């Protein structure tokens, strides 16, 4: 269905209109993006070429870093370009495309983090059956399911807003394409649509986060049965994953699991989960994973 609209493009206000401040932010976000790409690509390459990293956890970690690469690349390059050239205009179709990619890979990451928690549960609570349960085809299937889940979530989000009429104004007080600021510009009642957006994004994030907390509660309880060496190894892998989960889900829940309104703090929170978290994930996993660190040194 063709969208009923008069607006053909939107203007993203970004962080500031001051040219000097824009240049400072340009350097900062360019550095963040370079670090994100280098760190995540290093993990993908290490897992791919290393003979010692053949575990399901390493496979899922490579999948997570690949998602972070695409997710970050859907937002940061345009942000960096806008800060450098000062051209904050984006076409309606490009806005929708970025929105689709954000939700596709953001949703996929939610499901993949659940899969990784299940992998840790099997490894720690059912160690004798781990390789039987987490066979290669099972790992591939779980990864595909994560992507399909993100795809369906993204299709649903886009389908409920694409046909909205946008008659003007076309100025969005944000630095990237986000759902709630867009709903404010629709020249129709968006109350029901806002509830659907919250249910699809916020509710799914909240449920996933609660499931993760429960799973890690079970895992931590099971650590008592392990030897001291086993507890240390399990604690190392679990603590890194829990850190990533908290960094990703807490800001996401704040942004999505609330009424469809915008707040002054939204930009700062959005920077954390769209820019900072993808950059920190490789650092968190490598610092807490001795096997990954050793494999990187052999490259």
UniProtKB/Swiss-Prot annotation:
Q: Does the keyword Transport apply?
A: no
Q: Which residues are glycosylated?
A: 6, 87
| Molecular function terms from GO | G protein-coupled receptor activity; olfactory receptor activity
Report disulfide bridges, numbered on this chain. none
Keyword Transmembrane part of the UniProt annotation: yes
Q: Could you tell me the membrane topology recorded for this protein?
A: Multi-pass membrane protein
* InterPro entries, alphabetized: GPCR_Rhodpsn, GPCR_Rhodpsn_7TM, Olfact_rcpt, Olfactory_Receptors
Give the location in the cell.
Cell membrane
List all membrane-crossing ranges: 24-47, 56-77, 99-118, 138-156, 194-217, 234-256, 268-287
One cellular-component annotation, GO? plasma membrane
Q: Which SUPFAM superfamilies match?
A: Family A G protein-coupled receptor-like
Q: Which domain of life is it from?
A: Eukaryota
- So which stretches are on the Cytoplasmic side? 48-55, 119-137, 218-233, 288-299
Q: Which keywords belong to this entry?
A: Cell membrane, G-protein coupled receptor, Glycoprotein, Membrane, Olfaction, Receptor, Sensory transduction, Transducer, Transmembrane, Transmembrane helix
Q: Which family does it belong to?
A: Belongs to the G-protein coupled receptor 1 family.
Q: What does this protein do?
A: Odorant receptor.
The protein in question is named Putative olfactory receptor 4A4
């Amino acid at each position: 269905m063709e969208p009923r609209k008069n607006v053909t493009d939107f203007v993203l206000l970004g962080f500031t209109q001051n040219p000097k401040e824009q240049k400072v932010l340009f350097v900062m976000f360019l550095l963040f993006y370079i670090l994100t790409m280098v760190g995540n690509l290093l993990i993908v390459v290490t897992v791919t070429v290393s003979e010692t990293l053949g575990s399901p956890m390493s496979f899922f970690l490579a999948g997570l870093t690949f998602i972070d690469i695409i997710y970050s690349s859907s937002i940061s390059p345009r942000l960096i370009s806008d800060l450098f050239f000062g051209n904050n205009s984006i076409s309606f179709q490009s806005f929708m495309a970025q929105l689709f990619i954000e939700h596709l890979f953001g949703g996929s990451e939610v499901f993949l983090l659940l899969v990784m928690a299940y992998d840790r549960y099997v490894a720690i609570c059912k160690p004798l059956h781990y390789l039987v349960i987490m066979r290669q085809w099972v790992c591939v299937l779980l990864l595909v399911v994560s992507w399909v889940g993100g795809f369906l979530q993204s299709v649903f989000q886009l389908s409920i807003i694409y046909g909205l009429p946008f008659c003007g104004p076309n100025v969005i007080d944000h630095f990237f394409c986000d759902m709630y600021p867009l709903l404010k510009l629709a020249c129709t009642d968006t109350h029901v649509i806002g509830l659907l957006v919250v249910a699809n994004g916020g509710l799914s994030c909240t449920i996933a986060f609660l499931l993760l907390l429960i799973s890690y509660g079970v895992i931590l309880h099971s650590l008592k049965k392990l030897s001291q060496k086993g507890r240390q190894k399990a604690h190392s892998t679990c603590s890194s994953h829990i850190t990533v989960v908290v960094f990703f889900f807490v800001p996401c829940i704040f942004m999505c699991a609330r009424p469809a309104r915008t707040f002054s703090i939204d930009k700062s929170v959005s920077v954390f989960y769209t820019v900072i978290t993808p950059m920190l994930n490789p650092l968190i996993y490598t610092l807490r994973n001795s096997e990954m660190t050793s494999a990187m040194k052999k490259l």
